[in-house]
Amino acid sequence: MFKNISRILSVVALLSLVLAACAPAATATTAPAAPVTQAPVAPATSAPATVAATTAPVATTGAAPAAAGGWCSNVKIVFFPGGTPGGGFEQVVYNGAVQAAKDTGANVQYVWSDWDPAKMTTQFQQAAATKPDGIAIMGHPGDTAFDPLIDAAEGQGIIVTSMNTQVPLAQAKYAANGFGYAGAILYNAGYALGQEAVKESGLKAGDKAFLWGLKAQAGRGERTKGVQDALEKAGLKVIYQEIDDATNANASAGVPVFTGIMSAHPEIKMVITDHGNLTGTIQTFLQAAGKKPGDIFAAGFDISGNAVTAIQGGWLQLVIDQQQYLQGYFGVLQICLTKVYHFGGLQIDTGAGFVNKSNLDALVPLIKAQER
């Protein structure tokens, strides 16, 4: 299915070029941020680490396979999937990028960052030093840390675009140069999940919810803030815990933190995990805390194979779907469109809606293929 979509996107891009030759130049605009309301539904090396498989990553010394002689075949891209090879969320981002590379012929190299903002900025500098045509980043470090580095890269003629987490000041500054965004609008997505979780759980004012997130991260923390605002507006009492570095890189490291919170607050009725890999580990967390399916209303971000199992088993009740495959696909495509056709940056909101037990079945084959 996604191969067909990608071919269509390439054709649309070519048609757009032809139409552009016959029409006045248009000014790039960004889509208005709106809450997700429809319910259909983070080790690096000193040099870019590259991977060639589409579902089971294996380290290689070259870029992922690309279409020989494709329309973007002379374009060199460094791509940041975010976390670690094989991670439930970032592997799907990677698969989308690999498919885009195959469809366009782009020469793409992949850099894994353990979801560590400091590592991302260091790796960005290393990537820029190789003078690629473009770099597709995860925006977790935020404008303050990233913008001076982006300024330097743009000054060298390197196209930069972001995925998953916006870098809004840099995006506004360099939109005409191809700086786009593919991902959810973070605060709105967080607020929407919090609001939907309250609705589906039936919790009332005064009930306690445990929110495990990344509020301290510039930019990325907006999603956690959105969740908290929605819960507090509904009158829930929020017990908040920042995700530590070890758990951010490896979700299973968070078991002692989770059990400690649940032991200290046995009256908790809801858990929301603002991290795809933590959401996929919710069954492990709850079992370690001595809970049974349905004892706690659990919600979180990002559908994955583990999340599917947790939903089917009654451990996880609600997930907001970022459609992260598209984040990877459009990250590569944006740079190709800008380099080859001089298109400006596109803003693409991939946060489509919610997944729960009622609508899961249709997505299961795609999730198992790591395309959703």
Regions found by a protein language model. Name each.
Residues 16-21:
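C-terminal motif of bacterial Sec signal peptides marking the signal peptidase cleavage site
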Residues 23-372:
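A residue-level marker of the well-folded mature domains of exported/periplasmic proteins
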Residues 1-12:
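Bacterial N-terminal signal peptides that target proteins for export
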